[in-house]
UniProtKB/Swiss-Prot annotation:
UniProt name for this protein: Large ribosomal subunit protein mL57
Keywords tagged on the record: Mitochondrion
GO biological process: mitochondrial translation; RNA processing
Disulfide-linked positions: none
UniProt-listed InterPro entries: Ribosomal_mL57, RNase_III_dom, RNase_III_sf
Molecular-function annotations in GO: ribonuclease III activity; structural constituent of ribosome
Function: Component of the mitochondrial ribosome (mitoribosome), a dedicated translation machinery responsible for the synthesis of mitochondrial genome-encoded proteins, including at least some of the essential transmembrane subunits of the mitochondrial respiratory chain. The mitoribosomes are attached to the mitochondrial inner membrane and translation products are cotranslationally integrated into the membrane.
Subunit text: Component of the mitochondrial large ribosomal subunit (mt-LSU). Mature N.crassa 74S mitochondrial ribosomes consist of a small (37S) and a large (54S) subunit. The 37S small subunit contains a 16S ribosomal RNA (16S mt-rRNA) and 32 different proteins. The 54S large subunit contains a 23S rRNA (23S mt-rRNA) and 42 different proteins. mL57 forms a heterodimer with mL44 and stabilizes rRNA expansion segments 1/2 at a membrane-facing protuberance close to the point of attachment of the ribosome to the translocon in the membrane.
Family membership: Belongs to the ribonuclease III family. Mitochondrion-specific ribosomal protein mL57 subfamily.
Pfam families from the UniProt entry: Ribonucleas_3_3 (PF14622)
Ranges annotated as biased composition (Low complexity): 43-54
Location within or outside the cell: Mitochondrion
GO CC entries: mitochondrial large ribosomal subunit
Amino acid sequence: MAALTPSRSVFASTCKTIAQQCSRRPVAVQQLAAVPVARQVSSSSAVQQEQDASGTSSSQQPRPRWSYTPERMKGPGFSLNLVKDPRRKQWMVNSDPAKLDAFYDAFLGQGGSRMLSEETKWLAVTHKSFDYGRRGYNTRLAFLGRQIIALETTRSILTSPVLNEPIVDKYGRTPYNHAALANIDKLIYTQPLDIMDKTKIARMGIDFGLLTVMRWKPRMPEDLESSGVVVVLNSTLFAIIGAISLEKGAAVAQRIVREKILKRLGA
């Protein structure tokens, strides 16, 4: 194999030196204390500041998984993410468990904060854009929750009373009727997407304070709509339903969808 060029060898040795220095860097020993409700977090440097403020050493009480980035997932100390506007690197994310519990109580009702385990509560509100996805994210939970909500929405349409008169055939023909197919025609007039409108779901999430506890990093903090906040709010609510189904079962998740989502949307 050809020898490394001088520039490549210097780069490799520099990276190795930086990695060794990072591995020997002492870790601050602090007790878990009440952290601010929100702090400024960028994708790299500010996340490290959050870890230094709330971290503990391995000899002390172990830190919760949601509160820090694993050491082996960190880079050698520099970032290749070049941002044209430095102001876009700053964003406020919640790190207060009490504030997160207040959201779950408001959205799920009394005792909602105790419905999920501590790690799952944080995972359900964490988007993959936060900390480059190194603390876990809710994509798979959102997929599961989306299927549950689609199923319950379809069921609500099929069991709803008929609001439209049947179409009269101008040729006097009589369509085939069967008890098992009596409710299928209701889907002609109302589709699940008509009820589960993404704008309505996002508005419901904002009303319950989801935007203040959701962990994500918008592309343009000055323009959340262009950064996809509506889609992120929808996927986060879906992920909460998926997490409930995962830990409490499908029956509980379906009841939550009917009582806490469909009922509030007027279905």
